[in-house]
Swiss-Prot record:
Binding sites annotated in the UniProt record for L-glutamine: 46-48, 108, 137-138
Name of this chain's protein: Pyridoxal 5'-phosphate synthase subunit PdxT
Active-site residue numbers: 78, 174, 176
Gene Ontology terms: biological process: glutamine catabolic process; pyridoxal phosphate biosynthetic process; pyridoxine metabolic process
GO MF annotation list: glutaminase activity; pyridoxal 5'-phosphate synthase (glutamine hydrolysing) activity
Entry GO CC: cytosol; glutaminase complex
Domain of life: Bacteria
Gene symbol of the encoding locus: pdxT
């Protein structure tokens, strides 16, 4: 199994470190030819507008869309989740390039600025009974989950923070910033 981590911007190094810790040597994906080598792709947190623009510049939007869910499982964390959503609210003026692969609506920076970042327990039965500690940094919020897409993770107040659609996974938090590797292991099973 080959796992790529989109390494254009954001916290790709942290995802790579978790993958190595669980015995997977990741490929840092910066070019379309590297994308062709992977069966799974993690789109990390960072700045969604910047990552979207870089995907456009490096001509990777269409190759990712063409393979998504078929021979390419994709997991987006935070900014990566924004890029996977079919509807994004609170975009910068003029919009932003997205992959628009998952039937969900997501709101950018829903919890406020960097100063409003927080940690909170997450219920995610798909990875086990024990709550997961979620790290939310300028995090988006999943507003709604549409047909074919299912909510798989929640905050205590019922807010959806993780969704799955076939071989596509979106988390609005950063599992790579904790010692808990259960979401990474889940992704390897998609």
């Amino acid at each position: 199994m080959t796992v790529g981590v989109l390494a254009l911007q954001g916290d790709f190094r942290e995802h790579c470190a978790v993958l190595r810790r669980i015995g997977v040597e990741p490929i840092e994906v910066r070019l379309p030819r590297q994308l062709e080598q992977v069966e799974r792709l993690i789109i990390p947190g960072g700045e969604s507008t910047t990552i979207g623009r870089l995907l456009t510049i490096y001509q990777m939007l269409e190759p990712i869309r063409a393979r998504a869910g078929r021979d390419l499982a994709i997991w987006g964390t935070c900014a990566g989740a924004i890029l996977l959503a079919s509807v994004v609210t609170d975009q910068k003026q003029g919009g932003q390039p997205t992959l628009s692969l998952m039937n969900l609506t997501i709101q950018r920076n829903a919890y406020g600025s960097q100063l409003d970042s927080f940690e909170a327990p997450i219920t995610m039965p798909i990875i086990g009974e024990k709550p997961l500690q979620g790290v939310f940094i300028r995090a988006p919020r999943i507003i709604s989950v549409g047909s074919g897409c299912e909510a798989v993770g929640w905050l205590e107040d019922g807010s959806v923070v993780a969704a799955r659609q076939g071989r596509l996974l979106a988390t609005t938090f950063h599992p790579e910033l904790t010692d808990d590797d259960r979401v990474h292991r889940l992704f390897l099973e998609l």
